[in-house]
């Protein structure tokens, strides 16, 4: 019974990974749109996009860490 609950909890925690993938896609699609509108700001916008990517990926890594904790620690 407990093992099944752990698997369900870990599966629910990994749903955040799909959200992070959508978020990263939004970051880079916005970068492409912004550079297409104003190519002279491409270098500055790329820095902002990398920052957004890193923050979004950090959330995904935290969710993955929680899934592993649910599976192997509790």
UniProtKB/Swiss-Prot annotation:
Disulfide bonds: none annotated. The record marks 57 as: Reversibly protonated during proton transport. Belongs to the ATPase C chain family. GO terms for biological process: proton motive force-driven ATP synthesis. The chain crosses the membrane at residues 8-28, 45-72. It holds the Pfam family ATP-synt_C. InterPro entries: ATP_synth_F0_csu (IPR000454), ATP_synth_F0_csu_DDCD_BS (IPR020537), ATP_synth_F0_csu_sf (IPR038662), ATPase_proteolipid_c-like_dom (IPR002379), F/V-ATP_Csub_sf (IPR035921). This is ATP synthase subunit 9, mitochondrial. It comes from the Eukaryota. This protein is one of the chains of the nonenzymatic membrane component (F0) of mitochondrial ATPase. It is found in: Mitochondrion membrane. CDD domains: ATP-synt_Fo_c_ATP5G3. It is a multi-pass membrane protein. F-type ATPases have 2 components, CF(1) - the catalytic core - and CF(0) - the membrane proton channel. CF(1) has five subunits: alpha(3), beta(3), gamma(1), delta(1), epsilon(1). CF(0) has three main subunits: a, b and c. It comes from Marchantia polymorpha (Common liverwort). One of its GO terms (molecular function) is ATP binding. Keywords: ATP-binding, CF(0), Hydrogen ion transport, Ion transport, Lipid-binding, Membrane, Mitochondrion, Nucleotide-binding, Transmembrane, Transmembrane helix, Transport. GO terms for cellular component: mitochondrial membrane; proton-transporting ATP synthase complex; proton-transporting two-sector ATPase complex, proton-transporting domain. Signal peptide: none annotated.
